[in-house]
C-alpha cells in the first residue's frame, strides 16, 4: 500500500541539489513520486523511511523523518531531565532555532483578505510558510525574511502590519488594538444609527421618502448629513475597497462600499435632478446607507468583543508568569524583575508564590499546584532534585531552587508558542472554505449585476427603483466574513480549551483527523502501565539458590537498557554483583554473558529454546505467571534453566477508568506489546482491552498500525518511547504521553502534558467537539448565504409580492458573523463527559 513520507533535508544549497535528490529518489522502483525542495521532501510509494534516507545519503546529502501530516512546530529538541511529565512533554527550543515571526494585522475584513495577505507574505524571499488568522488578525511567518520585508509586503497588498517580538508585547498591543477597534466601531455605529434611525422612522410614519418640490431642500440636507456619516463612520469601508481595487481584489468591504455607495448616489441624483426620473421612481434611500453602515459597525464591535473571549484560554496561560522573582544572594534576598533572572541564579519560593522560571530544587520541600500546565488537579510533592516549572503555584512549603530555563525557554513559554501556532493553522475543511471565500466576492458582484439586469429588463415599473433595491440588497446581505471566521474561531477556542485540559495539539489538521478516529492503539509499557516493572516472584529449579539466581541475573542486566533490567537491578540493589564478560544483547530475546566461570542466558522462553535449553519441565510455571499478567524472565546457567523471575508492570491507577470512557465513546481499543500472548491477554482482560497484538518487536509496531489501517480503520497510536516514534508517525493521529521521549513527542500530532490516559479521552472528546462546532459554523454560513442571496435577489417576489429591505439585509449580515463567533465561544465551556 502506497504511503507518503515527509523528510527533512540537510545539505542542499541550490536547484541542482534538489534535482539530484529528486532523480535519486524517483530512480527507486518503490517510489511513485518525489516532491523535493531545498529543505524537505514528500515521497509517495512503498519504500520505508530508512530506505529513502539511505538513498538520499548515497546522493551526498542528509535526511531525517519529519511529521507526516504537519510540519513540526519546534525544529529541534534539547533533551530535558526526566523529572516530571511537564518538562519532557515539549521539545525544547532556543531563540536561534525558532524561525517564526508574528505580525499584528489591520484592515482585514473577510477571508478574501486572508488569502491576499497570505499570498503577499509567501511571495517574500526567505518565507517558507505563512499562516494568517482572521479571527485574531495575526500572521505567523516561518523563514528567514526580515520583519521590515514582511511588513512592506502586507502594506503593499493594501493592509497594515506590525512586527511583534514576543508574546508579552503581542498581548499588550493586541489588547490596545482590540480596545481601540471596539471603541471606534462603537462610536461609528452610534453616529450612523443616530442619523439612520430617525430618518427611517420619519419616513415610515411622517413621510413616504419620495422627493417633492416641497421637501427637496430638506432631503438634500439629509443627504449631505448621510454623506458625512458615510465619510466619518463608514470611511474605512470605502478606503479598504479602494485599496483592494487598486490591487485587483475584492473583499467584504467592496460589497458594503458598492451597496451603500450606489444607494446614496441614486438618492442624491433623484434629489438634485428629479426631472430625470419618473414620478414613481423618485424614492430616496439615504436611511439605507446610514443604517447599513451603523448595523455593520455594530456587528463588528460585538464580533471583536466575542473574539477577545475566544483567546481566553491562551491569555490565562500568559497570566501565569509573575512579574518578579525573589533572588537569593550572599547579601540576602531581594525582589528582581523577571527579565533580569538568568540561568544559574538561586531563587526562593514560599507558600502562595507563583514559580517565575523553570529550575531544580536545591533545598526544602513544597506542594505545587500544576493544574494549569498539566490539567492534573492533585498537588504534587516536590523536594531536592525535583524540577519546578514557571506558572505553577506553591500551595504549601518553602524551597530554594536554581533557575535552569528562563524567558522563551521555559516549559510554559513553549506551551504558549505551540498553542499559538496550532491556533494559526488550518484544517483541510478550513482550506476548502478559504478557496470558496477567495472567489466569493466577485461571484456575489456578478450575481448582483445579473439580478439587477433581470429586474431592469423584466421587472415591474418603476424598474430603476427595483433594480437599485435588488442590487444593493444582494451586495449587502452576502457575508464572506462569516465564512472566513467559521473555521479559525472554532480552532482558536478548541485548541485553547484543549490546553486547559493539558492537551497540546500540533495543528488544526490533527484535530480534524482525531475527530474521525474509530480505533485507539496503546503501547503497553509506560502507557497502559506505570513503566516501573517490579520483580514480584523468584522461583528456582534444580535446588538452585534463589539469592544466587537473583545475583547472576542482576549482574547480566547491568549492561542492558531494557525496562525489565531496572526491575531486576532494583531487586538486587543490596547485593555484590560479579563481573560479566562477553555481554551481548539478543534483540527481542534477552541477554547473554559469562560470570564466575558460568555461561549465562537471561530472557524469554524463545531465547532458551533458541540456545537448545530444555524448558519443558518449567512450562507450567511459565504459563502460570503469564496468566497472571507477569512477564516470565528465565535464567539459564551452563545450559540449564535454573530460575524464573516474574516481573510485573502494574497498570496505571486511572487506566481502567480511562479505557471505559473510550469504550463508551465508541472506540475499539487495541494493545500493542512485545510480551507473549498469554501475559498480554491477562493484562488486556484486566484493563478492558478489545484486541491484543502481542509479540511485536520494536520495528514491527508501525507495520501493525499499517495492518489495522488496511482494514479500513482510522487509527490513533498512544505511546511514549523512542521505539514508538515510527508507529506514532504511521498512525492517523499520534498521541505522545507526557514524560515520553523527545523523539516520540516530536513525531506525535497531540501531546499530553500529564502522564494519564484520561488525557487521551479528553483529547479525542475535544477534537470531536471542535470539528462538530466547525461544521456547524460552516454549515450556518453556507445556509445563510445560500438562502439570503436568492431572497435578496427577489426570488420570493412572485409568491409574496415583497422584497427584502436593504436595512434588514445589513442587520442579517452583521448577525451572521456574531452568530459564528458566539457559537465558537461555546467551546470555551466544553467539558468532556466522564
Swiss-Prot record:
Residues binding Mg(2+), per UniProt: 720, 724
GO cellular component, one term: plasma membrane
GO molecular function, one term: P-type divalent copper transporter activity
SUPFAM superfamilies given in the database record: Calcium ATPase, transduction domain A, Calcium ATPase, transmembrane domain M, HAD-like, HMA, heavy metal-associated domain
Transmembrane segments: 187-207, 218-238, 254-274, 284-304, 438-458, 464-484, 779-799, 801-821
Domain of life of the source: Bacteria
GO biological process: copper ion homeostasis; viral translational frameshifting
Residues given in the record as Cu(+) 1 binding sites: 14, 17
Documented EC number(s): 7.2.2.8
InterPro entries: ATPase_P-typ_cyto_dom_N (IPR023299), ATPase_P-typ_P_site (IPR018303), ATPase_P-typ_TM_dom_sf (IPR023298), ATPase_P-typ_transduc_dom_A_sf (IPR008250), HAD-like_sf (IPR036412), HAD_sf (IPR023214), Heavy-metal-associated_CS (IPR017969), HMA_dom (IPR006121)
Keyword Nucleotide-binding in record: yes
Residues involved in Cu(+) 2 binding: 110, 113
Active site (UniProt): 523
Catalytic activity: Cu(+)(in) + ATP + H2O = Cu(+)(out) + ADP + phosphate + H(+)
Keywords: ATP-binding, Cell inner membrane, Cell membrane, Copper, Copper transport, Cytoplasm, Ion transport, Magnesium, Membrane, Metal-binding, Nucleotide-binding, Phosphoprotein, Repeat, Translocase, Transmembrane, Transmembrane helix, Transport
Stretches assigned to the HMA domain: 3-64, 99-162
NCBIfam families: ATPase-IB1_Cu, ATPase-IB_hvy, ATPase_P-type, PRK10671.1
Family (UniProt): Belongs to the cation transport ATPase (P-type) (TC 3.A.3) family. Type IB subfamily.
Protein name, UniProt field: Copper-exporting P-type ATPase
UniProt source species: Escherichia coli O157:H7
Lineage: Bacteria, Pseudomonadati, Pseudomonadota, Gammaproteobacteria, Enterobacterales
Amino acid at each position: 500500500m502506497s504511503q507518503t513520507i515527509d523528510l527533512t533535508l540537510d545539505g542542499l544549497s541550490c536547484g541542482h541539489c534538489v534535482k539530484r535528490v529528486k532523480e535519486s529518489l524517483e530512480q527507486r522502483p518503490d517510489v511513485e513520486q518525489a516532491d523535493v525542495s531545498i529543505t524537505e521532501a514528500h515521497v509517495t510509494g512503498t519504500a520505508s523511511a530508512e530506505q529513502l534516507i539511505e538513498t538520499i545519503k548515497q546522493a551526498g546529502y542528509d535526511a531525517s523523518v519529519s511529521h507526516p501530516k504537519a510540519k513540526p512546530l519546534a525544529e529541534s529538541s534539547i533533551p530535558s531531565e526526566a523529572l516530571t511529565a511537564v518538562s519532557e512533554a515539549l521539545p525544547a527550543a532556543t531563540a536561534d532555532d525558532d524561525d517564526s515571526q508574528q505580525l499584528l494585522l489591520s484592515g482585514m475584513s473577510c477571508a478574501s483578505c486572508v488569502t491576499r495577505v497570505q499570498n503577499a507574505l509567501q511571495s517574500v524571499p526567505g518565507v517558507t510558510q505563512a499562516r494568517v488568522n482572521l479571527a485574531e488578525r495575526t500572521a505567523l511567518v516561518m523563514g528567514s525574511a526580515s520583519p521590515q520585508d514582511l511588513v512592506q509586503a502586507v502594506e503593499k497588498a493594501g493592509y497594515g502590519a506590525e512586527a511583534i517580538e514576543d508574546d508579552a508585547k503581542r498581548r499588550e498591543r493586541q489588547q490596545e488594538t482590540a480596545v481601540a477597534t471596539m471603541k471606534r466601531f462603537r462610536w461609528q455605529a452610534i453616529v450612523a444609527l443616530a442619523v439612520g434611525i430617525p430618518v427611517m422612522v420619519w419616513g415610515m410614519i411622517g413621510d413616504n421618502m419620495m422627493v417633492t418640490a416641497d421637501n427637496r431642500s430638506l432631503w438634500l440636507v439629509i443627504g449631505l448629513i448621510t454623506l458625512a456619516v458615510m465619510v466619518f463612520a463608514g470611511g474605512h469601508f470605502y478606503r479598504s475597497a479602494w485599496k483592494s481595487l487598486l490591487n485587483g481584489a475584492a473583499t467584504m468591504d467592496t460589497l458594503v462600499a458598492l451597496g451603500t455607495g450606489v444607494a446614496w448616489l441614486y438618492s442624491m441624483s433623484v434629489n438634485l435632478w428629479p426631472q430625470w426620473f419618473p414620478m414613481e421612481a423618485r424614492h430616496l434611500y439615504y436611511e439605507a446607507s446610514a443604517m447599513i453602515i451603523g448595523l455593520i459597525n455594530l456587528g463588528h464591535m460585538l464580533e471583536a468583543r466575542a473574539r477577545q473571549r475566544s483567546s481566553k484560554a491562551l491569555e490565562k496561560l500568559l497570566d501565569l508568569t509573575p512579574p518578579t522573582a525573589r533572588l537569593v544572594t550572599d547579601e540576602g534576598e531581594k525582589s528582581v524583575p523577571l527579565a533580569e533572572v538568568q540561568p544559574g541564579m538561586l531563587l526562593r519560593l514560599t507558600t502562595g508564590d507563583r514559580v517565575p522560571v523553570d529550575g531544580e530544587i536545591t533545598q526544602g520541600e513544597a506542594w505545587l499546584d500544576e493544574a494549569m500546565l498539566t490539567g492534573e488537579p492533585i498537588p504534587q510533592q516536590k523536594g531536592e532534585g525535583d524540577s519546578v516549572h514557571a506558572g505553577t503555584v506553591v500551595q504549601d512549603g518553602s524551597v530554594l531552587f536554581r533557575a535552569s530555563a528562563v524567558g522563551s525557554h521555559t516549559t510554559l513559554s513553549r506551551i504558549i508558542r505551540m498553542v499559538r501556532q496550532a491556533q494559526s493553522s488550518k484544517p483541510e475543511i478550513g482550506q476548502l472554505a478559504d478557496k470558496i471565500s477567495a472567489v466569493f466576492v466577485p461571484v456575489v458582484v456578478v450575481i448582483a449585476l445579473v439580478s439587477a439586469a433581470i429586474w431592469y429588463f423584466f421587472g415591474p415599473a418603476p424598474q430603476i427603483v427595483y433594480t437599485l433595491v435588488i442590487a444593493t440588497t444582494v451586495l449587502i446581505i452576502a457575508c464572506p466574513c462569516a465564512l472566513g471566521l467559521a473555521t479559525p474561531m472554532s480552532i482558536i477556542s478548541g485548541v485553547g480549551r484543549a490546553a486547559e485540559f493539558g492537551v497540546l495539539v500540533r495543528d488544526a489538521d490533527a484535530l480534524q483527523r482525531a475527530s474521525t478516529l474509530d480505533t485507539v492503539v496503546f503501547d503497553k509499557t509506560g502507557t497502559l502501565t506505570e513503566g516501573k516493572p517490579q520483580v514480584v516472584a523468584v522461583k528456582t529449579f534444580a535446588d538452585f539458590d534463589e539469592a544466587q539466581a537473583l545475583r547472576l541475573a542482576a549482574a547480566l542486566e547491568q549492561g542492558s537498557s531494557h525496562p525489565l533490567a531496572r526491575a531486576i537491578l532494583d531487586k538486587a540493589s543490596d547485593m555484590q554483583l560479579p563481573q560479566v564478560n562477553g555481554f551481548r544483547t539478543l534483540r527481542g530475546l534477552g541477554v547473554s554473558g559469562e560470570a564466575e566461570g558460568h555461561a549465562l542466558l537471561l530472557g524469554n522462553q524463545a531465547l532458551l529454546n533458541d540456545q537448545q535449553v530444555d524448558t519443558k519441565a518449567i512450562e507450567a510455571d511459565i504459563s502460570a505467571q503469564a496468566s497472571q499478567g507477569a512477564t516470565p524472565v528465565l535464567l539459564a546457567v551452563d545450559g540449564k534453566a535454573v530460575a524464573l523471575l516474574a516481573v510485573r508492570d502494574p497498570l496505571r491507577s486511572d487506566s481502567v477508568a480511562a479505557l471505559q470512557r473510550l469504550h463508551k465513546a465508541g472506540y475499539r481499543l487495541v494493545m500493542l506489546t512485545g510480551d507473549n500472548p498469554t501475559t498480554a491477554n491477562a493484562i488486556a482482560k484486566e484493563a478492558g482491552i478489545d484486541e491484543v497484538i502481542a509479540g511485536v518487536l520494536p520495528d514491527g509496531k508501525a507495520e501493525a498500525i499499517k495492518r489495522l489501517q488496511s482494514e479500513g480503520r482510522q487509527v490513533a497510536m498512544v505511546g511514549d518511547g523512542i521505539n514508538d516514534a515510527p508507529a506514532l508517525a504511521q498512525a492517523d493521529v499520534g498521541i505522545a504521553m507526557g514524560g515520553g521521549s523527545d523523539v516520540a513527542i516530536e513525531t506525535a500530532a497531540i501531546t499530553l502534558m500529564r502522564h494519564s490516559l484520561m488525557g487521551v479521552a479528553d483529547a479525542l472528546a475535544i477534537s470531536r467537539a471542535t470539528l462538530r462546532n466547525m461544521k456547524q459554523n460552516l454549515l450556518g454560513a453556507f445556509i445563510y448565504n445560500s438562502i439570503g442571496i436568492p431572497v435578496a435577489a427577489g426570488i420570493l417576489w412572485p409568491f409574496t409580492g415583497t422584497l427584502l429591505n436593504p436595512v434588514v439585509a445589513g442587520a442579517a449580515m452583521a448577525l451572521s458573523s456574531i452568530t459564528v463567533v458566539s457559537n465558537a465561544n461555546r467551546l470555551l465551556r466544553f467539558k468532556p463527559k466522564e
